Amino acid sequence: KDLPYFYGKFKREEFLKFSNVISKVGLEIKDISSFYFFPSGRWDIKFKDGLLLKLPNTDLINVLSKALLLKNNQNFLNSKIIDLRIKNRIISNG
């Protein structure tokens, strides 16, 4: 009933791999409104609270683990975008 929307053209294997990473870091599907897949092989996640998380196409377990910490960090509570595509950089609009 509350399944997220999916945007972009991706192979089933690509999503299954990404889904495995999501479950490993403890991300709840019920908190996600949409997934966006890009031709470069990377994903964005839009949460139901309005936050857009821009992910790189490598090191996803590590990056998603850090992203969840940032999402709940006081300094990022007003952020609508957290961009983690550049290694060792956090870009936020909040």
State the predicted function of each range.
Residues 1-94:
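Charged, solvent-exposed interaction patches on well-folded alpha/beta domains
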